[in-house]
Amino acid sequence: MGARVIDGRPIAGELKKRVASEVEGLAARGVRPGLATVLVGEDYAARAYERRVGGLAAELGCRYVCERLPREAEEADVLAVVGKLNADPRVSGILVLRPLPGHISEPAVFSALDPLKDIEAVHPVNAGLLALGRPRYVPSTPAACFYLLDRYLERSGRPPEEFYPRSTVVVVGRSNNVGKPAVSLGFARGAAVISCDANAYRAGRLREHTLKADALIVAAGVAGLIDESYVREGVIAVDVGINPVADPGGSGRTLLVGDLDFGSVARKAEALTPVPGGVGPITDVWLLKNTVAAGRGLASQAKARCLLRGSHAHSSLI
């Protein structure tokens, strides 16, 4: 029996219905969440992601704006855009699309975000809360990985709360937006977690680590990095890679492939995710889920401030 292919699209569809219901509930209270993206330059993957989330925001009834800057923009220009979005009451969530050009400091830009609008938890405060197990927002891609894993486990008759404490989760890649948060989420579920990156590969030890995985999350950004020699029989493999490559058939088209050598890994895996159509659709919806949560929180804060001002005005008349 071959490996099962975990299609993320129906899982994303179920999640989207829940998010749409939340948007409707907020609309009944006069609240409309708003997502803003900041795109610097013309990176292929970033532009594709911006188009997807913009379309999804419109579909769900959220406000959406993309602030586009040329690759030559100065860091001060990006910080000015972030400051403008921080102050805009119509914007509840801000996503700075990566990669940023090399002359712009990611830490400086991320630190400038309003933590309440930082829906990818890249601000130091939000990253710290996530590491402590008390996240304000869970970043969309690692959240999507575990949401997909949880749904797959449930549907195959294994409660996640029983699976993880008995299992080893291996995360390949240590990026701030995927690898490191995925490690935190694995620990939060009680799993033994192994984190490895390019250093393990250069030292010739990557295979040693990945062969221990009951669940393998690969977010290295290297097309076809993991083949069947890197995985044990029965692994559940989640591919986060989105690598644009030229069509080997010579059509001139650009194709997206993952970090798994899909056909090879499928010979040994219990289940694995495709690229595209695996983690990606869930990631998109989760970003809007965080945007809606941010909108709800900001609306509650605004209401509390109004009540407080009313209380002060009343007391001044007594």
UniProtKB/Swiss-Prot annotation:
Q: In which pathway does it act?
A: One-carbon metabolism; tetrahydrofolate interconversion
Q: Does the keyword Acetylation apply?
A: no
Name the catalysed reactions: (6R)-5,10-methylene-5,6,7,8-tetrahydrofolate + NADP(+) = (6R)-5,10-methenyltetrahydrofolate + NADPH; (6R)-5,10-methenyltetrahydrofolate + H2O = (6R)-10-formyltetrahydrofolate + H(+)
SUPFAM superfamilies, per database record: Aminoacid dehydrogenase-like, N-terminal domain (SSF53223), NAD(P)-binding Rossmann-fold domains (SSF51735)
Query: What is the superkingdom listed in this entry's lineage?
Result: Bacteria
Q: Which Pfam families match?
A: THF_DHG_CYH, THF_DHG_CYH_C
Q: Which family does it belong to?
A: Belongs to the tetrahydrofolate dehydrogenase/cyclohydrolase family.
- Name the chain's protein: Bifunctional protein FolD 3
- Species name for this entry? Rubrobacter xylanophilus (strain DSM 9941 / JCM 11954 / NBRC 16129 / PRD-1)
Lineage at the top is: Bacteria, Bacillati, Actinomycetota, Rubrobacteria, Rubrobacterales
**Gene encoding this chain?**
folD3
